Amino acid sequence: MTNISNRKDDHIQLALEARHQSQSGSHFDRLTFEHSGLPEQALEDTDIACHFLGRPIAAPFMIGAMTGGCNNGELINQHLAEAAEYCHIPMALGSQRAALEQGLAQNVRRWAPNATILGNLGATQLQQSGLDLAKRAVESVDANALIIHLNPLQ
């Protein structure tokens, strides 16, 4: 396992530890909303389906980029991909850098053959490796689009 994979596994483990969980809560329990229903609109007549990247999706929601390129990330991505497929919503992958550098299989299409999938690379890696890396990222997961994330600390 490489340093990148170890670091990404460490990120997941740190996020799961109790000492990194909020003790104060989110304070959403302090909020109350005034109900302003739409009695003239029946829920069964409401359709939030739309198109994204020219593809039909069930709702204007997307599973955001979470993790990638590490052992613990694969199971997380499997569950997210299965949810994207089941709910007919897009999924953005976490950074593909480690998987591409290590030649690891990226199985997202096995779990979400019909979902709209967005690959993901860092701008720094793209600047260093060029357009070929972007093409490999898209082709390796049969992505419908590619997200370029910015990390100013790199």
Please report, for each region that a protein language model flagged, where it lies by residue:
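N-terminal active-site wall of soluble small-molecule enzyme domains
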Residues: 79, 102-110
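Residues at alpha-helix caps and immediate loop-helix transition turns in enzyme cores, especially N-
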Residues: 76, 104, 129-133
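Short, compositionally biased "basic patch" segments
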Residues: 19-24, 45-55, 72-77, 81-82, ...
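Alpha/beta enzyme core
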Residues: 81-86, 110-117, 124-154
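Active-site cofactor/substrate anionic-group-binding motifs, chiefly glycine-
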Residues: 52-99
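A cross-family glycoside hydrolase active-site/sugar-binding cleft signature
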Residues: 64-65, 92-96, 118-122, 147-149
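An N-cap/entry alpha-helix motif that binds or orients negatively charged groups
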Residues: 1-53, 57
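Short, small-residue-enriched loops and turns at beta-alpha junctions
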Residues: 69-71, 97-100, 124-127, 153-154
